[in-house]
């Protein structure tokens, strides 16, 4: 049976009525997988995640999917905001396996928790087909899964070793300058010189990256790079990703022009963007940046601060539409002007 009703996490409680026999991440759940020698499904997300909601509706609320999951797997739900440690481990595994990551993060592991397969969002039929194939392999050739899990585990450990080794190697000042210059030159090759940001879509704001580029451009008197950062910040401020009515930035832009936002608003995104625009305002005195800062801080204080002085982590992308159904961006209306 589903065991999430006694949890305190908003995300886990959202799944408490699913027909899937979800369990929380705890020693009992992990022990049960070993005792029954079953593969584990570890599904990680958070309460404001749009694609988590979509996959729940399409798959985890579906009796046919639940029958497959309940019969052959131990299914564990994890709130990444409660257990960032668990999220970090399996995110590294997914990035090694697929070259990318995101949420919902869905991983299938051996009974001991070592991952053998994973990804992010899956449609119902793809999800069911994959689970059936994995179960068949586990029954007919478990040694293949064990061998793959061993190699993947070594890969995750190798990443850790490389990071630790690099932390102990301190380059000289000249070497450090050369490395940074090479990094920036390589970075410039991916710049979108028309709309700012990186030339791709979806387009994320990546405030830490532009913080670095802003400071680097200022220190090196690199006017071309400074103009690019200003182009990016200006395009973002005039794009659909910035809410000119209520303030605050959405999670990312679906298109490459910053026009169509993914409507979720995250506290940590907006906090970093306030810092970025503040530094940019110090250097340029651009009144647009000051307006962005003031509107964003007003949004955070009005919408994300609770009565006790704490902060909520996000505003969900989904809200009720006129038919009383959850829909991404239903609370927004507007049109694009060319």
What is each stretch, according to the model?
Residues 1-338:
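Replace the tail clause
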């Amino acid at each position: 049976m589903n065991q999430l009703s006694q949890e305190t996490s908003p995300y886990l409680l959202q799944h408490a009525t699913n027909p899937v026999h979800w369990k929380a991440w705890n020693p009992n759940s992990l022990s049960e997988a070993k005792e029954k020698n079953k593969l584990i499904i570890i599904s990680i997300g958070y309460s404001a995640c749009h694609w988590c909601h979509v996959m729940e509706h399409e798959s985890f609320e579906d009796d046919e999917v639940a029958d497959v999951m309940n019969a052959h797997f131990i299914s564990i739900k994890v709130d990444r905001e409660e257990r960032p440690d668990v999220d970090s481990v399996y995110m590294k595994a997914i990035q090694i396996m697929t070259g990318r990551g995101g949420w919902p993060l869905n991983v299938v592991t051996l009974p001991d928790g070592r991952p053998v397969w994973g990804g992010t969002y899956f449609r119902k039929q793809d999800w069911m087909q994959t689970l059936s194939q994995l179960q068949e392999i586990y029954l007919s050739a478990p040694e293949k899964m064990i061998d793959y899990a061993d190699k993947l585990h070594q890969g995750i450990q190798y990443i850790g070793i490389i990071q630790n080794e690099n932390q102990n190697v301190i380059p000289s000042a000249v070497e450090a300058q050369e490395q940074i210059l090479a990094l920036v030159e390589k970075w410039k090759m991916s710049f979108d010189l028309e709309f700012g940001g990186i030339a791709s879509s979806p387009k994320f704001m990546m405030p830490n990256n532009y913080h670095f580029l802003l400071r680097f451009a200022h220190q090196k008197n690199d006017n071309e790079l400074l103009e690019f950062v200003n182009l990016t910040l200006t395009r973002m401020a005039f794009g659909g990703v910035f809410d000119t009515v209520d303030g605050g930035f959405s999670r990312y832009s679906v298109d490459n022009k910053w026009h169509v936002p993914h409507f979720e608003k995250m506290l940590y995104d907006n906090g970093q963007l306030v810092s970025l625009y503040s530094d940019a305002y110090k250097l340029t005195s651009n009144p647009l940046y000051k307006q962005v800062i003031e509107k964003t801080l007003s949004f955070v204080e009005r919408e994300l601060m609770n009565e006790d002085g704490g902060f909520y982590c996000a505003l969900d992308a989904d809200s009720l539409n006129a038919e009383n159904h959850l829909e991404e961006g239903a609370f927004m209306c507007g049109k694009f002007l060319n």
